Amino acid sequence: MAIERVREAVAVGGNRNLTHFRPSPAALVYHQPMDPKQPVLRRDILAAAGTVFTTSLFTGRVKGANDRIAIGFLGVGTMGTADLGYAMEVPELQPVAICDVYQPHRDRAAASAQKGGFQVKAVADFREILADRSVDAVCIATPDHWHAYMTVEACKAGKDVYVEKPASKGPDEGLKMVQAARKYNRVVQAGTMQRSGGNFRKAAELVASGALGEITFCHTFQSETTRRERYGNLPDAPVPDGLDWDMWLGPAPAVPFNPNRWGERIVFPTFRYFWDYAGGAMTDWGVHLIDPLHQCFGEVMPKSVTALGEKFYVQDNCDTPDTMHATFEYPKFLVTYESRTCNPMPLFGLNQGAGTSIHGTEGSLVVNRRGVWVIPNAGSRLSGATWENIPDMTPMNVPHWKNFVECIKTRQKPTSDIETCVRSSSVCQLANISMRAKTRVDWDEANWTSPQEAAKPYLKTVYRSPWKLEV
């Protein structure tokens, strides 16, 4: 399936107000903006049938400044309930409906909405909300294997969409999500909310300025501590009261209920550690780590991916590895990813076990949710390492939701337009494919596929009948 390449000139100059990066006067000479006339190559995923794409403006009804946007929430577990809370902080939004296949989730979310001053309709089948013409938009915070289907159907129903990351379970699904957004002229914001965080915007500005010099290597990492038994080897069990297990599975294979597959926990539900529903740490944290690099380097994708991973320590009934390492060959630099669930030591002395580092001929930069850290090379024109956490740069979620609302009104592309998240998610999915197929995966971006035969079975997401993903 062809992907049309679109050139989009991006002005990078101007006053950057890099308050997070304070170079010496000597460094200021080097800290010059890029040529504003220099174009950046963008690759927008378009429908094979010739879907029209405009670089910044969608067609469709534009809401007035005083209109409130009626929004429904599909999936109100841990993340969905959090999203409901963020949405209630945006005055232009009117939560009107919630959906979950588990009755206690519906009850909890309805109570949360009522506490915030909203009366919502609670349903068990998301199709009721999509069929309701009074609903303008939906938030999708289900397990990953539902993201693509619900997003496509919401676009077809004329709803704008906020969908959590990763965009999908497989790269093929992600492509159809972008096609649906373009075909039906919908605003689709992905939940990669770091793009609305000041730390990450400043990192992108610093990279664009050229202050780090020529960049050839980047590194991403995620570390934590877990018990050997982690989530345990729980046996299959009766379906809990109030849970529609068959609907929870949806397009995934029909299997008996298992507490770990469902993963009803306060934090990090365990469904994400089964291949039927998600992609483990690689597509959970990995998307948040790779996405800042795409934000810095113009959404470019790698030419190839090689990954290794195993369950060396953890002994539970989940599928995904406890230790993983991946190498991504981008056109002008290499990126590595490491995930250690058995060792919590953070890198670079950070007090958060996750981050992204960028290394150039003048210095290095580390960015995470706590700040931006610049480390000059010896003899560099940069002077003095800086590490700061500016409080007003930290908020991400509510500003991300406000951006979604603004774009619904103006029909502009949002900060995390679905295409950006599909790219970041697909890169992480390719790493999992490389690991599972035990092969290097070369990425043919123009045709959204890989020539490696061993990888091809993993590139196609199979849906259980009667579910079909059709744009």
Predicted regions and their residues:
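N-terminal Rossmann-like dinucleotide-binding module
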Residues: A48-G116, Q194-G197, L293
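Beta-strand-loop-alpha-helix segment that lines the small-molecule cofactor/substrate pocket
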Residues: P143-D144, A148-S196, G210
